[in-house]
Amino acid sequence: MKTKTDFLKMKEQGEPITMLTAYDYPSAKLAEEAKVDMILVGDSLGMVVLGYDSTVPVTVEDMIHHTKAVRRGAKETFIVTDMPFMSYHVSLQDTMINARRIVQESGAHALKVEGAGEVISTIHYLTNAGIPVVAHLGLTPQSVGVLGGYKVQGKDAESAKKLIEDAKKCEEAGAIALVLECVPMQLAELISEQLTIPTIGIGAGQKVDGQVLVYHDLISYGVNRVPKFVKQYTSVQEEIVRGISQYVTEVKTGQFPEEKHSFTMKEEECLALYGGKQ
């Protein structure tokens, strides 16, 4: 399994880091078989798995439950788990309780937190307690209401400079990596050059140290729309609907199950069942 040290070496050597979300045993198993470097159990599960309109309703218990399943499916892959909404915007003591629960109960190797400001001290606090932390700047979905929607961040010089400052503070606080979401590629490149920790982009262009996508977006599974930054490498959704539709048709028309899908009794036992055996 790759570790923090391996990811730092990958950045130094210019080897791109691959990260993919996974939320359950089968998706994690497939991600590991595909040799993904790092798995993110994102609170995006609220939208793509649980059907919520945002990530806000996701709880600590949800993250623990799904991360445990991912750990069972990907035992040899580094796993990062999101701390959900309001689980770390509380007292440091309560933040530690939530963080400890996720790490101890789920087996996550690192936690991810969004934003800067007061979150910087949280990164420092968790790091000092021995919990690796991945920072997340740019578009931070948990704060989408404050940001005014799902918009590109850092498009003007002033806000871009603020993101650069925040990125440096995250590194100084002890973050082992930084996710940059929906920021101009020029800004992402500049931040990546100024940090020693890896940057993982999602909608941040090529000049970052790695990329992350949502599992369901990448394979077109259960999604109707995807953001501009997503490339869909396959479409399992069409095949799944086709297969289920065929199943429904065959049951309705009596084509399924066939004899080869059924079990039988010996003839004498069948006779005995119907009273034909003395």
Swiss-Prot record:
Localization of this protein: Cytoplasm
UniProt GO BP: pantothenate biosynthetic process
Cofactor note as given: Binds 1 Mg(2+) ion per subunit.
Catalytic residues identified in the record: E181
Catalytic activity field: 3-methyl-2-oxobutanoate + (6R)-5,10-methylene-5,6,7,8-tetrahydrofolate + H2O = 2-dehydropantoate + (6S)-5,6,7,8-tetrahydrofolate
Keyword Zinc attributed: no
HAMAP family (UniProt xref): PanB
Assembly notes: Homodecamer; pentamer of dimers.
Name of protein: 3-methyl-2-oxobutanoate hydroxymethyltransferase
Lineage of source species: Bacteria, Bacillati, Bacillota, Bacilli, Bacillales
